[in-house]
Swiss-Prot record:
Propeptide regions on this chain: 29-34
Keywords, comma-separated and alphabetical: Antibiotic, Antimicrobial, Cleavage on pair of basic residues, Defensin, Disulfide bond, Fungicide, Secreted, Signal
GO-annotated biological processes: defense response to fungus; defense response to Gram-negative bacterium; defense response to Gram-positive bacterium; killing of cells of another organism
Disulfide links within the chain: 88-119, 95-114, 99-120
Biological role: Significantly inhibits the growth of Gram-negative and Gram-positive bacteria and fungi in vitro.
One Pfam assignment: Defensin_big
Keyword Flavoprotein: no
Tissue expression per record: Expressed in hemocytes.
Record organism: Argopecten irradians
Major subcellular site: secreted
Record's protein name: Big defensin
Signal peptide: 1-28
Amino acid sequence: MTRPSLVRCYSLFFTALIVMAIICPAWSEEIPKSRKKRAIPIAYVGMAVAPQVFRWLVRAYGAAAVTAAGVTLRRVINRSRSNDNHSCYGNRGWCRSSCRSYEREYRGGNLGVCGSYKCCVT
């Protein structure tokens, strides 16, 4: 059996909770039912963006706003672009689909940087 003072304490506590719930409702009437529309930053309008940025924009502004602004998802860099037009062999060669007349193909190690292309050195 509980003590009378403890019962009074609990009853006062729950009464205070009920009074607070009546006086301070959890949902304020001042908050509008629909959110205000937020504009996408001008830097992203009509742009093709990376997948991470696209997901962030959709989360922040909504899919309809992102589509209306013309923001598109940039395609994954295709193989020819990711393997062409950069140096190889310690900056002494260049990745190309075919070596030029004054170049020879390097067949040493670490050819993964060129992918399907050839590392052409002078």
